[in-house]
Regions:
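ATP-dependent adenylation/nucleotidyltransferase module used to activate substrates
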Residues: 54-178
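C-terminal beta-strand edge segments of enzyme domains
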Residues: 1-57
Length: 178
């Protein structure tokens, strides 16, 4: 799938005159800028790229993609097997970023409507994360207490609902079947 960044640029003779926010949660953006066509300024074409923001932009793009997926699929939220490792932790944070980024641009009411969730005025961002993200730590005899504690701490810090159970019986059942 593609994620459209929604970037709007207005330039003249290689000079950037105006720019709107990329990766917006808004339905649309409008940008206006005065351009003098009678006496345009002559400038050298200069492209400056700030590569230090690549990771930040990845987070914005991925959280916007998850936001769009939730809206378009009309799902009630996300369920994540949170192992305490880097991969599942990253996904949990990206879901939480939906709310951080969404609330930076939209009112609580507008965001709640788009996400299909009931938002109360006194709900915190963590409360809202708990409404769209449920996590489960599925431990076995091979799991460490460190991964359990890591998963639990992350879920609590972002407000996700956290469940845990042992799945040794299920693992043994699969192993015996094979």
């Amino acid at each position: 799938r593609m994620i459209y960044d929604g970037d709007i640029l207005i330039a003249q003779k290689g000079s950037l005159k105006a720019r709107k926010r990329r990766l917006s949660f808004k339905d649309y953006q409008v940008l206006a800028c005065d351009i003098n066509f009678e006496a345009p300024t002559k400038t050298e074409i200069k492209i400056e790229e700030d590569f230090s923001k690549d990771l930040e932009e990845f987070g914005q793009a991925a959280s916007l993609a998850l936001f769009d997926y939730k809206r378009k699929s009309r799902s009630k939220g996300f369920v994540l097997s949170l192992s305490g490792g880097a991969d599942s932790s990253c996904i949990a944070i990206l879901v939480a970023e939906i709310l951080r980024n969404g609330l930076s641009e939209l009112s609580k009411e507008a965001l709640g409507k788009k996400l299909g969730i009931d938002i109360k005025e006194n709900d915190t961002r963590a409360d809202l994360t708990g409404k769209i993200l449920q996590t489960a730590y599925q431990g076995t005899k091979n799991s460490s207490n460190e991964t359990f504690e890591s998963a639990k701490a992350l879920a609590e810090s972002i407000g996700a609902r956290f469940y845990h159970w042992n799945i040794d019986d299920e693992v043994n059942s699969y192993v015996s079947t094979l």
